[in-house]
Every structure is written in structure tokens, then in C-alpha cells.
Amino acid sequence: MSVLAPPDISGDLLASVATLVLKGVLREWDDVSFVVDCSVMDLIGGKVDGVQLSGAKWVSPLNLTCESLRCDVGAVEIDPIALVSKQAVELRTIPVGDCVVRFNTTDFGNFLVHPEMRRAAKDAGTEWGFDFDFHGQGVVLKDGAVVFSGTRGGGGGERCVVAMRPVGPRSVEVTRVDGPCGDETTEALERFFGELAIDLLGAEVRYGDMVVDDARVTLSLTMRMLRFPSSLQGLI
């Protein structure tokens, strides 16, 4: 009687399953790549030392887009049975890490009007009176700043144009460019981005820092992976 070889439960298997699942969630992509750091024996026990995700030209179902991204998370425990039997990535612990996401002006506009950003703005409005409705059109990169617009209730719904530039970790400076943007509005925007935390399909991401050049905005984010994405969990 022949002895069947055990199923492959290596880091490559986890990377393949994670890639397949994430491609099933995204609407478009040029690249989705995972690199898993673990030994075969550790993964059999559900232990992973770290995971790196890289991607390019992503488009989500709700039109969150980016030129590229790279995320690195540390140690995590997964369910190895679910990985083999269900081809699913089910987390037993919450890994933490960092992401670097690069946006062009269209991407950043899509980010500003994404439902999770609107939810964050609404929550901030309830919590401490934030009052700014972001516009996705007309984003411009100039002199190391992102120039964008929105409307505020205190301004009677008039268009307000501001410039936002990084001034250090978890800190931005917002200045008026045009419209009814007083100190109250610019200071509120500074606080909003400095405290920004949103949930993107299981990943709780927080603003860390930003670099702006003539072609793109590069956001550095910290993250906690609360659950791995699934097409059954909703859209991003």
C-alpha cells in the first residue's frame, strides 16, 4: 500500500491562498504578491513570523485606488486547518505592521471620498464637531502640499480650498487657499488627519506620515490586521 505525501503546508501555500483571496476581493490589479516568513513546522502549528504584501494599480469595488503599496506585518497566528481545508486565511491573533501607499492625484481624490473616510468624518463630527465634506475632484500637488477642496456647514456650503503638507509624524499643516476657510476649519482638518483611523476591510489603518512630490502622495500608515479580507465580508 502506497503512502500518500502530506499536503503542502509551507509559506508558499499561505502566500498562494492569500493572493487568491485578495484578487477575488479587488476589482482590478496589476500585481498582488505575498511573501511569508515561516518554517514548515511553525506553520503546521499556525505560527507565522511575518508577512509582506506588495501590489500595484489596485482598484477596489468602491473605487479605492492606488499606484502601489507595500505592507509589512509581524508575527501572527492563523488556523492551519482552515488554510488547508477551506483555502481561507483565518487569524487567531492580531498582527501589527506598517504600510506605504502611493497615490496619484486621482487616487488621492478617490481616497478622500471613500465611504470609510466619510464615516470617519461623520464620527469625528459626532465626537468633537468636525464639519467638512471632502470633494474628490480637483486634487493638485504643489510645493510639497496636497491641495483639495470641500464644503463646510459653517461656510453655508460654500467651496473651501486648502493645502495640506506634512510637518512630522502624525502631524500635518493645513492652510487656506480659497473660500471660507478660517482657522477653525484648518485646525479641524489638521486634527482630523492627525487622528485618522479607518477600517479597510479588516485592516485598521492610522495616519503616520506623508511625502508629497510633483507626481504623487506617499502615505505611511500603521496597521492592525483585525481579520483577513474576504469577498464575503463586504467591499472596500
Residue ranges with predicted function:
Residues M1-I236:
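Extracellular/lumenal and peripheral-membrane lipid-interaction modules
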